[in-house]
Regions:
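Amphipathic, heptad-repeat alpha-helical coiled-coil/stalk segments that mediate oligomerization
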Residues: 1-166
């Protein structure tokens, strides 16, 4: 019995370490967060019955006015030929700080940082002008936030965030 308990404890500790490693990877590496967000987005499109390469295109290369290569995460092809551009943006670090906050001061700071992170993504996305660079694109770009908690936290902090982004 003692050996079984030790084994259970060892497995539990190994699981905790793996979970912490994954959380740290997502929290501290922008590229990992971005890849995760893109994967969530493409999974949703696929699970909705859309076919990659036919109804949506991942990381299509487009050029801006200066010839610089840009790659929106997804371009969805509408039935009428219009294009809907979707770019995934992840704000996980500040949200994780909010969830782990131990007092109101830490929570308030994390709420503000989360809002600022999302707003920074909005501004960066707006500067890319994807909608002007893709033929038949609708005049707006959708920003997909795969972490619903982060999105809700930002909207609760500033309900006008969506209209400001538009």
């Amino acid at each position: 019995l003692a050996q079984s308990i030790r084994t259970i404890i060892e497995h539990d500790q190994a699981r905790d370490k793996t979970t912490q490693t994954l959380a740290n990877a997502l929290k501290n590496r922008g590229k990992v967060q971005g890849d995760w967000g893109e994967q969530v987005l493409t999974n949703i499109l696929h699970d909705s019955g859309l076919r990659e390469g036919e109804e949506y295109f991942v990381q299509d290369n487009i050029k801006d006015e200066e010839g610089k290569n840009l790659r929106p995460d997804v371009i969805v092809k509408g039935a009428d030929g219009t294009r809907i551009i979707i770019d995934s943006k992840v704000s996980l670090t500040a949200y994780s700080d909010y969830v782990g906050a131990e007092d109101d001061e830490q929570r308030k700071a994390a709420i503000k940082a989360n809002h600022e992170s999302i707003w920074k993504h909005v501004e960066e996305l707006a500067k890319k002008n994807y909608a002007k660079l893709v033929d038949n694109a609708v005049p707006i770009v959708l920003m997909f936030v795969p972490n619903e908690g982060s999105y809700i936290l930002a909207m609760n902090h500033d309900a006008s965030l969506g209209s400001k982004a538009y």
